């Protein structure tokens, strides 16, 4: 019987464990480490704080961050400030969801399975595709997995990706491709969109697929109909990375004939959280159903004829046959997928369209204000909620100045492209007011 039942790692615990493994002391466990490199001094740690004192100190540190509750944010580039209905946190905090893991036992996991099924259904409907999986880690890894699928399906070892795809997603793809010995070629961007002529020249018999973003990194809406025709005439797959909120207004990629549609559902119910964790989605046509990575939940009936939900087509997955799995993704983002599901269900179809329309209207209002003030605004008016403004000063310097005025500025495009030095990618969501937009434009007057 343990002497100290509720106190872990007592001397008694240590002795019992050492006895079991036949070692006399803890030092004996580390005998392989040379004496001269062992740390033998006392740890120079400050005295422990009480809980109230610790909370005060952590709150003080946290207050140094510029958060989107107190600051007007015009920063996007893949992570956006959107309204999150209060019901989202209430639902995902329920213990049945919050502590749930992969629902391998359907007879005791119907609630979780149905929640995942609803997420799949809504994503499939938004993207115009036949089916969607239960989630991926984020938009970038979903894009990379899509390229791996395309290569495996076509038995080709080269992927083309538009230069107007988010650079970070492009880098994730290149990382994945290295291990699979897949070549990645970037098709240059021209005037904020994919260079069509360059794509025509690059298409060949060894191309597995072409990756395009819709709307793209610069906010522009790519001509999917034209791209689809070129790609499919080459017997390659069309892979589209999309902002799901924009699909409340834009024609879904599936209606243009996309083979795979991926993206990140952060725009629905998931906070920015310094860049993650978020929630990727992955939608395909029926012909690719058995090659989809990750979990798939299907609807069925039990022996009594009652509707039920189960994990289906599991032979694709690594927990069944690791060496033959379509992907080695295991745990997914089910909790964040639930958050997105609750947010979408709360909005409803009408609310989602209204939210998308507010993004469109407010961003176009902001662009017009910049033009009225004499700023150079790049590219066409065919954008959703992001556009590019050219300034006369370094964006880093401008953004530091904006912070002093309670504004989080846009993304510094010069970080990735030298030709876009002093160019700011501005995102305007439904959260921004007319007064905030006007103040933002006025604050940039000195950098015109």
Curated annotation (Swiss-Prot):
Its EC number is 1.4.4.2. The keyword Transmembrane does not apply. It catalyses: N(6)-[(R)-lipoyl]-L-lysyl-[glycine-cleavage complex H protein] + glycine + H(+) = N(6)-[(R)-S(8)-aminomethyldihydrolipoyl]-L-lysyl-[glycine-cleavage complex H protein] + CO2. SUPFAM superfamilies: PLP-dependent transferases. PANTHER family: GLYCINE CLEAVAGE SYSTEM P-PROTEIN, GLYCINE DEHYDROGENASE (DECARBOXYLATING). Belongs to the GcvP family. N-terminal subunit subfamily. This is Probable glycine dehydrogenase (decarboxylating) subunit 1. It comes from Listeria monocytogenes serotype 4a (strain HCC23).
């Amino acid at each position: 019987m343990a002497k100290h039942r509720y106190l872990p790692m007592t001397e008694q615990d240590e002795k019992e464990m050492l006895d079991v493994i036949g070692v006399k002391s803890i030092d004996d466990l580390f005998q392989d480490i040379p004496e001269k490199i062992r740390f033998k001094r006392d740890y120079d740690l400050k005295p422990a704080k009480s809980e109230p004192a610790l909370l005060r100190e952590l709150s003080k540190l946290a207050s140094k961050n510029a958060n989107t509750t107190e600051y007007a944010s015009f920063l996007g580039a893949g992570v956006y400030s959107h309204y999150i209905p209060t019901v989202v946190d209430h639902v995902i905090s329920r213990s049945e969801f919050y502590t749930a893991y992969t629902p391998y036992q359907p007879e005791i996991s119907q609630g979780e399975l149905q929640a995942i099924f609803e997420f799949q259904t809504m994503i499939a409907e938004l993207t115009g595709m036949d089916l969607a999986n239960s989630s991926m880690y984020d938009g970038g890894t979903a894009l990379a997995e899509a390229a791996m699928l395309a290569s495996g399906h076509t038995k080709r070892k080269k992927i083309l990706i538009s230069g107007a795809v988010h650079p970070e997603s492009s880098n994730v793809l290149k990382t994945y491709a290295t291990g699979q010995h897949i070549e990645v070629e970037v098709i240059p961007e021209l005037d904020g969109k994919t260079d069509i002529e360059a794509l025509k020249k690059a298409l060949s018999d060894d191309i597995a697929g072409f990756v395009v973003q819709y709307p793209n990194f610069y906010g522009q809406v790519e001509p999917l109909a034209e791209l689809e025709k070129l790609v499919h005439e080459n017997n390659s797959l069309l892979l589209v990375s999309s902002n799901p909120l924009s699909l409340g207004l834009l024609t879904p990629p599936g209606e243009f004939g996309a083979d795979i549609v991926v993206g990140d559902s952060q725009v629905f119910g998931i906070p920015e959280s310094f860049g993650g964790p978020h929630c990727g989605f992955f939608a395909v046509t029926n012909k690719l159903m058995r090659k989809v990575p990750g979990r798939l939940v299907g609807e069925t009936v039990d022996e009594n004829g009652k509707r039920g939900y189960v994990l289906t087509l599991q032979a694709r997955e690594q927990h069944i046959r690791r060496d033959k799995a379509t992907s080695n993704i295991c745990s997914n983002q089910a909790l964040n997928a639930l958050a997105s599901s609750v947010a979408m269900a709360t909005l409803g179809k009408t609310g989602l369209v209204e939210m998308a329309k507010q993004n469109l209207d407010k961003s176009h209002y902001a662009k017009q204000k910049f033009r009225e003030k004499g700023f150079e605004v790049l590219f066409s008016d065919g954008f959703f909620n992001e556009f590019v403004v050219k300034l006369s000063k370094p964006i880093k310097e401008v953004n530091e100045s904006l912070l002093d005025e309670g504004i989080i500025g846009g993304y510094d495009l010069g970080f990735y492209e030298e030709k876009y030095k002093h160019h700011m990618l501005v995102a305007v969501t439904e959260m921004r007011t007319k007064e905030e937009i006007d103040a933002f434009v006025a604050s940039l007057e000195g950098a015109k």
